Amino acid sequence: MARVTVQDAVEKIGNRFDLVLVAARRARQMQVGGKDPLVPEENDKTTVIALREIEEGLINNQILDVRERQEQQELEAAELQAVTAIAEGRR
């Protein structure tokens, strides 16, 4: 099991409280959302992987916001295409 020094991750995010929020959000993405880790898993839990990603500067709150916004836009575009196809099929 890898040991993560939280201090390095805190320095990347700013404070411990925001670090907890960002790491939990990213870990949840990997567990529930099926998102792939950006660092080698090395048999670590998602929380440790999230902390390693933060420590390496691959993840922060702004990056998570941008990714979620892009995914939401892609989902909405796909839904719009499906609705358009249904509407055109009824004509």
Curated annotation (Swiss-Prot):
Catalytic activity: RNA(n) + a ribonucleoside 5'-triphosphate = RNA(n+1) + diphosphate
Keyword terms, alphabetized: DNA-directed RNA polymerase, Nucleotidyltransferase, Transcription, Transferase
GO cellular component, one term: DNA-directed RNA polymerase complex
Top EC class for this record: transferase
Domain of life, source organism: Bacteria
EC number, UniProt record: 2.7.7.6
SUPFAM superfamilies: RPB6/omega subunit-like
A UniProt-annotated Pfam family: RNA_pol_Rpb6
Function: Promotes RNA polymerase assembly. Latches the N- and C-terminal regions of the beta' subunit thereby facilitating its interaction with the beta and alpha subunits.
Family according to the record: Belongs to the RNA polymerase subunit omega family.
The name this protein goes by in its record: DNA-directed RNA polymerase subunit omega
Organism: Shigella flexneri
Gene coding for it: rpoZ
